[in-house]
């Protein structure tokens, strides 16, 4: 069976009720989806200087490089290959032949920081522009090495910058599509080392791809559950009063799942962004 990853965007609501989409908004979404047909997954989005920068895994299971798509209207996109990360630049004895995948990019001040998976390791890069040139923030070493633990998968790192300027990193998954674990720690100002010791913050029915957002003083930990290769994959969320929780799953979770009337599956590993006064979810799915 051919697997095609489709990157899509849709309106999203995290306020305890289902999102309401007007006819005008629905038409806009329909015209834009899918955004990138092909083998692209695990999107991360940055808005900078009037343009959208979408970072993606260039193949469903990782490649020797990562790519970035750029647009100023969210409809017409140009492809760019990044100088970092590459498998050659992100290799340790523990990463072996695993590829690079699942990029996550955040801006803090005048610097962009990227967190990327390679095997069961997390690497951190930095740049002054979304397209680079990028460099490894820690020389030739991973930020979270593969020997951290053998009980969970060290992948899918995502940074969150709070209103007070403090920054946090969330990451973690499970083995064999089960028993996902999510960890969090406050970051130092360099965004590539920890100020606090990592703690487990795993919410209900968590597997991978954590993403933190803040709304009206509450912390929303969004994440994927299930197998990315089948209809069990979906996006859920839980709410807490601080970046470390505890997090209680909301009543309208999941907020993204398979539509039984469509021949698609595996919607998830998302990112959230705001534009034009609306909040959107960007995600991949299989067809």
Model segments located where?
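Bacterial Sec-dependent N-terminal signal peptides
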Residues: 1-26
């Amino acid at each position: 069976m051919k697997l095609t990853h489709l990157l899509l965007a849709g309106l999203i609501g995290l306020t305890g009720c289902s999102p309401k989409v007007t006819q005008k908004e629905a038409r806009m979404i329909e015209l834009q989806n899918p955004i990138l047909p092909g083998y692209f997954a695990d999107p991360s989005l940055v808005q900078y200087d009037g343009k959208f920068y979408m970072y993606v895994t260039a193949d469903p299971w990782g490649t020797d490089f990562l790519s970035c798509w750029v647009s100023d209207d969210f409809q017409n996109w140009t492809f760019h290959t990044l100088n970092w990360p590459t498998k050659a630049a992100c290799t340790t004895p523990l990463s072996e032949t695993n590829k690079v995948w699942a990029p996550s990019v955040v801006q803090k001040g005048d610097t962009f920081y990227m967190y990327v998976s390679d095997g069961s390791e997390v690497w951190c890069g930095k740049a002054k522009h979304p397209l680079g040139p990028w460099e490894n923030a820690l020389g030739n070493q991973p930020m979270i090495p593969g020997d951290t633990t053998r009980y969970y998968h060290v992948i899918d790192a995502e940074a969150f910058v709070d209103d007070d300027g403090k920054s946090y990193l969330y990451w973690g998954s499970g083995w064999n599509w089960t028993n996902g674990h999510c960890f969090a720690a406050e970051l130092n100002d360099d965004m590539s080392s920890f100020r606090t010791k990592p703690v487990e913050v795993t919410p209900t029915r968590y597997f991978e791809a954590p993403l933190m957002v803040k709304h009206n003083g509450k912390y929303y930990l969004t994440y994927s559950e299930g197998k990315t290769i089948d209809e069990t994959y979906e996006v859920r969320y839980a709410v807490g009063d601080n970046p470390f929780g505890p997090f209680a799953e909301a009543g309208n979770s999941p907020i993204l799942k398979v539509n039984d009337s469509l021949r698609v599956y595996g919607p998830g590993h998302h990112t959230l962004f705001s534009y034009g006064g609306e909040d959107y979810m960007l995600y991949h799915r299989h067809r």
